[in-house]
């Protein structure tokens, strides 16, 4: 039995975990097949994710959860940076970079990645290995995504690197499983205008952006919903399996 901490940026991205593991009490782990799991909402953006991971894993402070995990799993949505990754494709990170040039690339657990990818593919779920990059800003169009792709990354998110970095300090291996919600050519509403100082969304500003771009916002929400269906299917398979021993 492995103890697994699962991080997602938002309750929406973590909803599959709540359903699969029947998470009811955040103070105690939920049994899920071969794993006991804690679900943690990190918040959106690198700063929020780092702060929450440090709290939970006991880096710089006493841990908010008393049990040290065997592994950490980061889940959620990501943006595709290459033509080869369509919307709805599940990706397992082999490593993650930061848009901060001085920071080194961090590797995910090779054992967990191999087990997750092998299990998903054998179960009929397409899952690509990919290098991710974490950015404090939302990549809203092809030009911005191609600029990020120059780093060698194939997908972008806003939290994974911060959690990987913190977990490395705590001596805990990490796997990252995300799903492509917006492909290389999708144009998103400019929600960067709604980001607060910590990198999260200011709800009032986000509403104004949405009202100013109603069609793009509707398409974004629809794409996110479709992507989460693919991620849910993948999580239903791996969360009950011994992938994180």
Describe each region flagged by the PLM.
Residues 180-245:
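Regulatory input/activation interfaces that engage signals or partners
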Residues 16, 115, 143, 147, ...:
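Exposed alpha-helical structural elements
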